[in-house]
Design a protein with these regions (language model features):
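Membrane-interface amphipathic segments in extracytoplasmic regions
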Residues: 1-319
Length: 319
């Protein structure tokens, strides 16, 4: 394992993954096609382990989200490599060093829809408290709820930045500190296609980019007015400036956008499923912890009783 103290950029490299077989370094950014790109790289690298999905106890809403588990994607973190390998990854012309970006406002909308509106697991409680549902005639008003979020993140930014889904993209990829060789914009199909082609060339595969984590399908223009857009543009000003995304023009006022009957039912079902999943996941993790602890106690007693002859294999001591 790399000693982080000897790797000067380690504090900035916590998100970066590597696909050693195809020599690709990738910095995933949440809500920027990261599920799709991780799956692509894991398959190309030959490290994707679908069999492990069934044994996970974490709260995953969809099977596609399990690709973020290291045990599933098999992609090591840059900071966990030996120092010599880190230096090669960061400097060798043989390595592709890539990151993806997305329009900051579109990304913020996607993050709100997933983390706040849908109550995705792991969302900070304080962020959800700051963004209660806004109602119109007794129905959830998506436009007013999104406006509430835009005000909240502008006024209480720190409460949201605990969740990396809301972090500015510049804070994650650190483009001024790492020598990336490719940047792709997810809005540009030809750029994404170029990345997929390069990965396939390196892996000698014919993989395609799969789409995951689709939202409710409500266009941003239906729920975002110019006031919300301005607040979010200010919050993510560094992304607009660094990545060259222009500010967009929105209507001064948007009409209420209450959820339809089917949409409201879907939202209730989704939130209910999240609550149940979190409860089941907590119970599963607790049970796994109890079983692990019991095994360790038994092994300790067995080793003591046999004067160290039992469970002598170091690889089995903590299994």
């Amino acid at each position: 394992m790399a000693r982080r103290g000897r790797f000067a950029l380690a504090p900035l490299a916590g998100f970066i993954l590597v696909a050693p077989r195809i020599k690709v370094m990738y910095c995933p950014t949440t809500k920027v096609a990261c599920s799709s790109l991780k799956l692509l790289l894991a398959k190309a690298n030959g490290s994707y382990d679908a069999a492990r999905v069934e044994r996970l106890v974490g709260p995953h809403i969809a099977r596609s989200q399990t690709i973020h588990e290291r045990r599933v994607n098999g992609l090591p973190k840059l900071v966990d490599l030996p120092l010599r390998e880190i230096q090669e990854v960061l400097a060798s012309p043989e390595w592709l060093r890539v990151y993806a970006t997305r329009d900051p406002l579109a990304r913020a909308y996607s993050a709100w829809e997933n983390r706040i509106f849908s109550r995705a697991p792991g969302t900070p409680d304080r962020a959800i408290e700051l963004c209660p549902d806004e109602l119109a005639d007794g129905r959830v008003d998506v436009a007013a709820s999104f406006a509430r979020f835009a005000r909240a993140i502008a006024e209480h930014t720190d409460a949201f930045m605990e969740d990396h889904h809301f972090l500015p993209q510049t804070h994650i990829v650190q483009p001024d500190r790492f020598d990336y060789t490719m940047r792709v914009r997810v809005e540009e199909p030809e750029e994404m296609a170029r990345l997929v082609a390069e990965v396939n060339r390196r892996a000698d595969t014919r993989l395609e980019l799969e789409r995951h984590n689709q939202g409710f399908g409500i266009p941003l223009a239906e729920v975002c007015d110019k006031h919300s857009a301005n607040r979010l543009a200010a919050t993510y000003a560094m992304d607009h400036e660094r990545f060259g995304y222009p500010t967009r023009t929105f209507a001064a006022i948007v009409a209420p956008r209450p959820l339809g009957q089917v949409e409201a039912s879907l939202l209730r079902s989704f939130r209910g499923a999240v609550e149940q999943l979190q409860a089941v996941s907590f119970s599963a993790r607790s049970l796994a912890g109890v079983r692990f602890g019991a095994r360790q106690i038994w092994k300790s007693l067995a080793r003591h009783a046999t004067l160290g002859r039992a469970y002598r294999d170091p690889a089995q001591v903590h299994w």
